[in-house]
């Protein structure tokens, strides 16, 4: 019996490098689908931001966008907001205070991390209760309790799967909840040290090459050999 039936992948810094998914990485993901397993794409990007760099949504069973706020079924062309949107009062005030560029999604906003203190002050001045999630050089502004974990949980429920059956792979701070939630959390070699420190496995190769490496292990023996060797956090894939 297959233990890990779902692979949940972060986008930037994981399957993609500077917004580009290499053909070899895409081929590896297609192998996962052909094996009968399910694929989730999990990203802080809005739909518009993702569309500008990556059009192969059909490879995935579900997309978790906006850091867990929006769930998309690409085959059916349907989407569900998983939370109430951030207050509309915030956008004009952020722009008035010079927070540009400001990406506006269905439920969240995103900006450069250099604006972090201004964003915090603005939220406080408006009396709003929101979460801020830093992702390397960006910050996502989102409703309380929304994360990649909550988004993946919704996606798994929608496809009739469980966290125990899921392998999640990522590289940055906003991936931490998802990796902890999954049955097996994997960090790519280029991931932040804090991510690699808590991952069950760490790939030997970076980004998309590391994902292809992970796929090889997943399809070979359901990661049994890698997890047997691991015996603890952060063991390297072979």
Can you annotate each of these PLM segments?
Residues 40, 64, 167-169, 186, ...:
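Hydrophobic/aromatic beta-strand patches that form the interior of the parallel beta-sheet core
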Residues 6-8, 62, 167, 196:
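Hydrophobic "anchor" residues on beta-strands that sit immediately upstream
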Residues 87-182, 186, 190, 196-198:
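Conserved acidic, metal-coordinating active-site core of Asp-based
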Residues 7, 32, 63, 185-187, ...:
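Short, well-ordered beta-strand core segments
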Residues 1, 181, 186-238:
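Asp-based, Mg2+/Mn2+-dependent phosphohydrolase catalytic module
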Residues 2-19, 179:
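Asp-based phosphoryl-transfer active-site loop
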Residues 18-104:
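Active-site phosphate-binding/coordination module
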């Amino acid at each position: 019996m297959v233990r890990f039936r779902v692979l949940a992948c972060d986008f930037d810094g994981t399957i993609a490098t500077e917004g580009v998914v290499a053909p070899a990485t895409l081929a590896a993901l297609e192998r996962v689908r052909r094996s009968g397993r399910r694929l989730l794409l999990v990203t802080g990007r809005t739909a518009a931001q993702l569309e500008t760099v990556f059009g192969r949504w059909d490879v995935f069973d579900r997309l978790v966008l906006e850091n867990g706020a929006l769930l998309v079924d690409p085959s059916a062309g349907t989407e569900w907001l998983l939370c109430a949107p951030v207050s509309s009062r915030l956008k004009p005030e952020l722009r008035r205070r010079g927070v540009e560029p400001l990406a506006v999604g269905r439920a969240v906003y995103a900006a450069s991390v250099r604006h972090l203190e201004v964003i915090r002050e603005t939220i406080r001045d408006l009396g709003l209760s929101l979460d801020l999630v830093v992702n390397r050089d960006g910050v996502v502004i989102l409703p309380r309790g929304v994360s990649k974990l909550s988004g993946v949980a919704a996606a798994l429920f929608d496809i009739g799967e469980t966290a125990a059956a899921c392998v999640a792979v990522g590289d940055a701070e906003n991936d931490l909840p998802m990796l902890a939630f999954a049955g097996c959390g994997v960090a790519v070699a280029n991931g932040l040290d804090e991510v690699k420190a808590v991952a069950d496995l760490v790939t030997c190769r970076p980004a998309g090459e590391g994902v292809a490496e992970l796929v090889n292990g997943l399809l070979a023996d359901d990661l049994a050999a890698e997890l047997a060797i691991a015996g603890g956090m952060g063991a390297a894939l072979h």
